[in-house]
Amino acid sequence: MSELVGVSRWGYAMAVGMFVLCVAGNGKALAQDAPSSDPSASPRERALRDQLKNILKELDELQQKKESEKPDAERPTIIKEKAESASPEAAPEATSEATPDFDLADMSIVSKRHQKRPEGISLSATVPSETDSQPTRTMKESMESLPGIVLRQANGPRDFSIMIRGQGAKTSFAVRDIKIYEDGIQQTQSDGLSRLDMQDPWFMRSVEVIRGASSSLYDNYALGGMVQFRTRRGRDIHGLETFFSGGSFGYQKYGVAIGQETERFDVAMFGSHVAEDGFIQHSNYNTQTINFNVRYKMDGRQNFYFKAITNWLNTKVPTRLTQGQFLTDERQAGGAQTSCTPGTYNGGCANSLLLDQSRVDRRTIVGGIYERQIDANTVLTVEADYDVKDIQQSFSQIFENTNPNYKSYADLRHDGRLGTMPLKSYVGFFVNMMEQKGNTFQNLADGFGTKGTLLQNSRATIFNIGGRFREELEFYPNWILAVGLGFEQSRLSVHATNYDQTTGAFANRASANRTFSNWAPEGSLTWKPSADYRYWIRASTGYGIPQFANLLRDPVTGQPGTNFSLKPQKNLNLEIGTEMRLHPTLLVQVAGFYTFFKDEIITQVISGINTASVNADSSRYRGVEVFADWRPVSGLRVSGAYTHIDSEYINFSDRTAAGFIVRDGKHVPNVPTDILNGKVEYYHAPMGLGAWVEGNYSNSYFLNNNNTFGFPSYVIGNVNVYKNIEVSNSSWFRFAKLFVQVDNIADTKYAASGQFISGETHAQAAGQQIFFAGYGRAVYGGVTLGLF
């Protein structure tokens, strides 16, 4: 950590920047709550809301004082508001409608004064229209409407890697280095792997993203931040909904939603079936998802939330294309240039058709959250879930893994005072454990994915336990100092037995037992003297421990063995930001960040085909994130998100066939430099007719360490027209929502994702497996019917 401490001068520079920014803002700051999406409120209305907020806050405090002086038996029952409470484990939902922080109906002792989200963080959330008007294939377009986040196509229809501020950039499949939640239930397994296969866009109300290292809040693997998916409530559905859509390349989707809210219950259940032939050859799939949610208000003090999700996925997987293949035919299955003999195992074969590359995966999560109001100022939350992943994946080798995972956390949140200063306190504890049972077989490359000889069987466990605390002190009116600290101990145990690939006889064993202890401090300063402006500076840290496979190769020889020298990867995030409502119709968010990455875990070739995981000493990422939301007239919304990242290695020697090469000053591969999303949407409420036009731009960036081969830039345009029909005189039909959408309207040829590759020259790099092609022009249409 000494290298990280050495960069403290940046903290002073950012503090000076904060002062300049505050002076420029003429004494106004934005409230911490996620911004309302209705900027049309008049200044008088906003002033009245602020007055009401302050009056209710003072009444609340007087009532608490009066009740605290009574004997317990004489105190009234505490009534908790219906709004969902969320802990730092599950970042709270961002309000997307024009709802005041306090309403006349919220005359309860427990009000929204309780912590709804941490102070001093970069937080953005999608509005419901991002998913409501385009419930088609994936979450990519709606999530990239937020600044700082990039999604890349991976191995499946909804399988995307996620990058935030450069973290997660080298992940070629699934999600790593970023924590994923849905409705407060953790989706990231204990080994740090998340997949978006379970997230169906039609189920979602919004997506929230916390950007920047956040391990003090979300523990292991939160190097880039946190993503929280919010499903629709029963009150949003209010009956039965059916959904159908279809489109290009054989796409078809069917869905049903059932939901209702009563005085004590809110129940919502979703189910969907999706199938497609695919744009790329050998990418056809079908997937089914069920998502069940029950929220139960047990009494005035207690709430319970139950969630069950299951997803079945059967998808073919193409191979990434070389540059030449991509330029010739971007829709080919890939891997034809590799050495393959039908009926014979070859670890270097990547012909997706001969290997019959596929994923047959199932994942189920069942969990619950219990919340109890202990007193007027204290809330206890306890979460527990069971998460099991069962996979069979065929590539050059065939993998069969089962990963049962048990996860739980408990926390206490308290709103109090330190002297006369408001103080919000949080303390939490968590524990989770995952087992992995796996077998690896040869793939005989006969076009059917036939298993050959057993190559390896393995057994592994990971056990994480830790705690954290956080204090947010309003030491001066509208100035909030937040400090937090997290600690986690992780124990990994993995044993693998390897077999000879020719005879199938026992070859060798490899095992590792490692214990890692990590600390994650965080601090921030926020200034928000009004509801329209907010400024903050933040210093936060993240960490991620090695994966099982990282520990089973000797770093000196590359042979099977124990990697005793591998360390957790860590980062330090420094940021300064502002969120400003420059006009009742215009909201702007700007954040600058500087992230130092230490001991990144990478794979290097030691000799021949022998590889091992090592730590790259240090790199840095700096950039700016900009978001704007303008509503000049009723029904019209103009929004945009821009992210710029400049990255480079600070101290890194790369091991190549020619020896060690110093990469200091080189750009970190696969980190985009410029990402821009812009959208213009208009909805004419009297007619129920709306439309939007969206553009996405990605600049070029390097994919290899020597910076000789790059990812091509692109511009993509999408258009959508939708119609909402309300039916008022029928007991069978309530509404119909119809949409037609055209993606990539110009039929641009582009790469949806690249991956980190080796090779010193452009020619050496160009011959590797690099690109997945993005979809050509595609037309989709669909209808949602509200019944009963």
Label every PLM stretch briefly.
Residues K112, K140-I185:
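Extracytoplasmic beta-strand/coil segments of soluble accessory domains associated
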Residues Q32, Y543, P686, Y697-F702, ...:
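C-terminal beta-signal and adjacent terminal beta-strands/loops
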Residues I185-R211:
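Short acidic/polar hinge/loop motifs at secondary-structure boundaries
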Residues K82, T95, L481, Q489, ...:
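Gram-negative outer-membrane beta-barrel transporters
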Residues L418-M434, R459-F597, E681:
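Structural signature of Gram-negative outer-membrane beta-barrels, strongest in the C-terminal barrel
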Residues Q260, F265, V379-D385, I391, ...:
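Membrane-embedded beta-barrel scaffold of Gram-negative outer-membrane proteins
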Residues G239, G246-A275, I280-T319, Q357-Q373, ...:
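Transmembrane beta-barrel wall of Gram-negative outer-membrane proteins
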Residues E81, P88-E93, T99-K140, D159-M163, ...:
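N-terminal periplasmic "start-of-domain" segments of outer-membrane beta-barrel proteins
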